[in-house]
Amino acid sequence: MASKGARDLIRMVSSAGTGHFYTTDKNKRNTPDKLEMKKFDPVVRKHVMYKEAKIK
């Protein structure tokens, strides 16, 4: 059986409060801190800050 890899599935949630999110993965060994990046939110039709959250 293969061992679990270093990549975790994460959810990037919009800081605009619209409830929109993107899913992606990240290498938890190389980037242990939380991700923050500007991405397009189609609900408000603007680029806003997205922050990392756990997938439920």
Curated annotation (Swiss-Prot):
Gene3D superfamilies: Ribosomal protein L33. Belongs to the bacterial ribosomal protein bL33 family. It holds the Pfam family Ribosomal_L33. It comes from Marinomonas sp. (strain MWYL1). GO terms for cellular component: cytosolic large ribosomal subunit. Keywords: Ribonucleoprotein, Ribosomal protein. PROSITE patterns: RIBOSOMAL_L33. InterPro entries: Ribosomal_bL33, Ribosomal_bL33_CS, Ribosomal_bL33_sf, Ribosomal_zn-bd. One of its GO terms (biological process) is translation. This is Large ribosomal subunit protein bL33. It comes from the Bacteria. GO terms for molecular function: structural constituent of ribosome.
